[in-house]
């Protein structure tokens, strides 16, 4: 599998002020292990991912693995957090880029961008973990708080990325409904082998774009710069 969102050889961190070469090397090794873990989740599934497979994929010794993660449960917990953070970073990066020069937040285009993100291996791994957690109590206990943290962070970042929309009385329900609906459609299309560009899917997406735009119509005349200025003034 070759995909830029998951790599067993991630870009290495550069030494920063206050950090020694050894500290940076340790962080690089940890990151490489986490990337390799996500790769293994994607390739072999959760239950077939072993620390031996991860260490081999990460090209680190068993000793290095044990230094960072003495137990598989610790590795899984860190990998789940790493997965969620990668999804959040991807979401923020792409949606900020989309709206960089926009006067008003591009709602329909934003829904399309998020939909494309749900076709990535990152979301497929998330689905793999959800299914595995149904019969794995330890994974379930790990996922539950991580999912809550993800949802809080997703909502918080959405308010920052879409300053004008965040002023709407319907902002929370609009963003939550969009995420839940798109994730549900993505799971359905993946499980049935249906194309994300099928007429069936596109018809639903068109309805969602129109519905969400309608929910946020109360702030349609407020531009992004005005909203950001108002937010800045309220903090003073």
Tell what function each PLM region has.
Residues 32, 36-43, 90-94, 125-129, ...:
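Solvent-exposed, amphipathic alpha-helical segments
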Residues 81-87:
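Short, basic, alpha-helical segments at the C-terminal edge of helix-turn-helix-like DNA-binding modules
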Residues 88-89, 93, 116-127, 137-164, ...:
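Amphipathic alpha-helical packing segments from all-alpha helical-bundle domains
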Residues 1-28, 39, 191, 217-236:
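N-terminal intrinsically disordered/low-complexity leader segments
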Residues 78, 91-121, 174-178:
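Hydrophobic alpha-helical connector segments
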Residues 70-74, 78, 134, 138, ...:
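Residues in soluble alpha-helical coiled-coils and helical-bundle/repeat scaffolds
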Residues 32, 36-74, 78:
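Helix-turn-helix
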Residues 140-144, 160-236:
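Hydrophobic/aromatic-rich alpha-helical bundle segments in the mid-to-C-terminal region
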């Amino acid at each position: 599998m070759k995909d830029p969102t998951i790599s067993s050889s991630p870009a290495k961190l550069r030494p920063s002020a206050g950090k020694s070469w050894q500290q940076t090397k340790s962080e690089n090794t940890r990151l490489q292990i986490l990337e390799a873990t996500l790769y293994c989740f994607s390739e072999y599934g959760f239950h077939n991912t072993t620390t031996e497979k991860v260490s081999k994929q990460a090209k680190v010794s068993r000793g290095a693995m044990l230094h960072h993660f003495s137990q598989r449960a610790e590795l899984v917990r860190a990998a789940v957090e790493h997965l969620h953070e990668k999804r959040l970073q991807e979401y923020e990066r792409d949606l900020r880029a989309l709206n960089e020069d926009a006067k008003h937040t591009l709602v329909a285009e934003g829904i399309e961008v998020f939909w494309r993100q749900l076709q990535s291996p990152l979301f497929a791994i998330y689905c793999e973990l959800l299914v595995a957690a149904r019969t794995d109590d330890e994974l379930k206990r790990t996922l539950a708080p991580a999912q809550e943290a993800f949802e809080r962070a997703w909502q918080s970042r959405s308010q920052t990325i879409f300053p004008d929309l965040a002023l709407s009385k319907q902002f929370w329900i609009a963003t939550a409904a969009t995420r839940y609906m798109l994730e549900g459609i993505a799971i359905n299309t993946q499980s049935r082998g249906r194309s994300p560009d099928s007429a069936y899917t596109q018809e639903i997406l068109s309805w969602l774009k129109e519905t969400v735009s309608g929910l946020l119509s109360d702030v349609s005349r407020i531009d992004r710069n005005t909203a950001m200025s108002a937010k800045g003034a309220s903090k003073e």
